[in-house]
Amino acid sequence: MKTKVGVLYGGKSPEHQVSLSTAMAVMNAIDPHKFDVIPIYITPEGQWIKGEQLTGPIEEIKQLQFTSAATALIPVSLNQVPAADSAAGGNEETIDVIFPLLHGPNGEDGTVQGLLEILNIPYVGNGVLASAVGMDKVMMKNLFAQAGLRQAKYIAVTKYDWQKRGETVYDRIERELGYPCFVKPANAGSSVGISKCKQRGDLKAAFIEAFQYDRKIIIEEAIVGREIEIGVIGNDEPICSVVGEIVPKKEFYDYEAKYEDGQTELIIPADVTKEQYETIKQMAITAFQVLDLSGLARVDFFLAEDGAVYINEVNTMPGFTPYSMFPLLWQHSGVPYPELIERLIALALERHQEKQTITYTFKKEKR
C-alpha cells in the first residue's frame, strides 16, 4: 500500500513564489510507485485549497495555483485532512504524512507545524520550537553564542527603537560593527529584504526595506571570505553532506541570485581542506542539536580569508528548486533526489512514532 503524502505549499508569505517552485520540483521527484501525492495549496490570502491526487508530472507552476472552485479545507477535522467529498458527508481520506514546503513567515516559522501537532499528523521537517528559532535570526544567533559557535558580530533593533532613537542606533552600528554591514529582517528567508550598507547614508533606506517584512531586524558585520553551505539530515543521529560554495555574480547572494538561473555559480564539492570540512561539519551538527532540529536543515557558513570558519545561519526548510543548493549537495553525496525525499518522509514518520510514546496526561495517585 502506498504512503499518501500531502504536499503543503504556497502560504501567506513574501516567499510564496519560492514555495511554488519548490513544490513543483518535489512533487515531480516523488516516486509514484511508493507514494500518492495530494497537493494542498495555501493562497496568498491564507485560504487552504486541496487539489486532486496527482496522476502525472506537473508541467507549469500555474497548475498548482488552485482557485476556490477546488476543495476548500476549512474547517479541518481533527486527525485527518478531509477529502473532496467529506464536506458533503462522503468518505474521508486520511493523509499519512504532510510535506510542508513553505518558506518564510506563516509556514517555516513554527505556525503550521503547531497546527499539525494539534492535529497529530506526521510532517516532514523541524518541529514547532526549532522552526520558530530557525526563522528568527536574532534568537538563533543568541543560541549560537551560548553554544560557543564562532559567528559575525550582530545587533538586533526593533522598529520602535529605530523610530525613537534612530541616530543612536546608527551610532551603535558604526561603533560596534563598522562598514560594510548587512541589514536583514529577523524573520525572513531567501534573502528577502536584505541590504548591504557601505556608509551611514545607506542605513535609513536599508532599515525601511527590512522593516517592510518584520518588526525586528538584525545588522551584521560583513565577513570577507567565501560562502559555504552544508546539508544535514536526520533526527537524533544527523549526518552531513559534502560542502558547496556559492559564487554570486552580483555583489552578494540576494533573492534574484538565488532563484533566477544564471545569477550565481554553485561549486560542489567546494574546495576546502579536510580540517576545514571537519570544522564545518562539527559546527553544523552542533547547531542542529542546539536548535533541536530534526529531519533536515541547510547550514550556511563563511570561510574567512584567514581560514577561520564562521556560522551564518540555518535554514529549516531549504529550497528544492532546480537551482537549490540543498538537493544538489545530497546528489553529490550519493543520495539522488527521489531517495532524499523518501528519507525525509521516513524521518518524519519515525519522529511522529516516537511522539506517540509520550504521556500527555498526569494522574496523581491517591495516598
Curated annotation (Swiss-Prot):
**Residues that hold ATP according to the record:** 174-229
Instruction: Detail which positions bind Mg(2+) 2.
Output: 313, 315
Judging by the UniProt lineage, the source's domain of life is: Bacteria
What cofactors are annotated for this protein?
Mg(2+); Mn(2+)
EC annotation from Swiss-Prot or TrEMBL: 6.3.2.4
The record's free-text note on cofactor binding: Binds 2 magnesium or manganese ions per subunit.
Keyword list, A-Z: ATP-binding, Cell shape, Cell wall biogenesis/degradation, Cytoplasm, Ligase, Magnesium, Manganese, Metal-binding, Nucleotide-binding, Peptidoglycan synthesis
Keyword Ligase found: yes
Residue ranges of every copy of the ATP-grasp domain listed in the record: 141-346
Q: Where does Mg(2+) 1 bind?
A: 300, 313
Query: Is Nucleotide-binding there in the keyword field?
Result: yes
Which pathway does this polypeptide act in?
Cell wall biogenesis; peptidoglycan biosynthesis
Q: What does this protein do?
A: Cell wall formation.
Q: What is this protein called?
A: D-alanine--D-alanine ligase
Q: State the organism named in the record.
A: Geobacillus kaustophilus (strain HTA426)
Please name the gene that encodes this protein: ddl
